[in-house]
């Protein structure tokens, strides 16, 4: 019986060890599964958070670009409106300039009565004043500038008349603000 007890105890202790090992393996397996599940759960959340942040950054960049583009469109539109407003009378001024030239030619005719001459001068002056109010100015003819003058004839320069000085103006030139409407036709010493 002593042998039986010994065997029983041994078998019992082996079986308890197996149970303990199984229990420990189960606990370890459960802990490992929980850890893996936690890691798996944390990883998608982190990825989702990162993705959400990236998308938010992307949307913010798109918004900022769209906002900047809208500001540029508004600025360009405003500049275009200002340019149109500034030069709105360009076509009208170009159409009126030949009439102004005709008034100048009529005033140059000899034999006009004082009343007719005064009437032509008043008409010319009121026309010039109306053009000035719109920003139309006569081109200066101090010295030749190819940007504002058209040389229709040249004369040889001498001591009295240096090169690039204007001898005579055939037709006055006009500009609207800084934009040339018509160059002055001049005779130039060369």
Swiss-Prot record:
GO biological-process terms attached to the record: protein folding
InterPro entries: GrpE (IPR000740), GrpE_coiled_coil (IPR013805), GrpE_head (IPR009012)
Protein name per UniProt: Protein GrpE
GO molecular function, one term: unfolded protein binding
Similarity field: Belongs to the GrpE family.
Region called Disordered, residue ranges: 21-49
Function: Participates actively in the response to hyperosmotic and heat shock by preventing the aggregation of stress-denatured proteins, in association with DnaK and GrpE. It is the nucleotide exchange factor for DnaK and may function as a thermosensor. Unfolded proteins bind initially to DnaJ; upon interaction with the DnaJ-bound protein, DnaK hydrolyzes its bound ATP, resulting in the formation of a stable complex. GrpE releases ADP from DnaK; ATP binding to DnaK triggers the release of the substrate protein, thus completing the reaction cycle.
CDD domains according to UniProt: GrpE
One CC-aspect GO term: cytoplasm
Keyword terms, alphabetized: Chaperone, Cytoplasm, Stress response
HAMAP family (alphabetical): GrpE (MF_01151)
Subcellular location: Cytoplasm
Self-association state and partner proteins as the record states: Homodimer.
Organism per entry: Streptococcus pyogenes serotype M1
Biased composition (Acidic residues): 23-42
């Amino acid at each position: 019986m002593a042998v039986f007890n010994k065997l029983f105890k041994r078998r019992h202790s082996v079986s308890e060890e197996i149970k303990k090992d199984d229990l420990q393996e189960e606990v370890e397996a459960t802990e490992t599964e929980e850890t893996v599940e936690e890691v798996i759960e944390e990883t998608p959340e982190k990825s989702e958070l990162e993705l959400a942040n990236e998308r938010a950054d992307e949307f913010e960049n798109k918004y900022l670009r769209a906002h900047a583009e809208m500001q540029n469109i508004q600025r360009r539109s405003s500049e275009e409106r200002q340019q149109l407003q500034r030069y709105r009378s360009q076509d009208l001024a170009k159409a009126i300039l030949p009439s102004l030239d005709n008034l100048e030619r009529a005033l140059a005719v000899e034999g006009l009565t004082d009343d007719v001459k005064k009437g032509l001068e008043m008409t010319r002056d009121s026309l010039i004043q109306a053009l000035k109010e719109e920003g139309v100015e006569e081109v200066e003819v101090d010295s030749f500038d190819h940007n504002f003058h058209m040389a229709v004839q040249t004369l040889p320069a001498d001591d009295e008349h240096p090169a690039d000085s204007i001898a005579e103006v055939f037709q006055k030139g006009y500009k609207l603000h800084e934009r040339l409407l018509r160059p002055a036709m001049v005779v130039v010493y060369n």
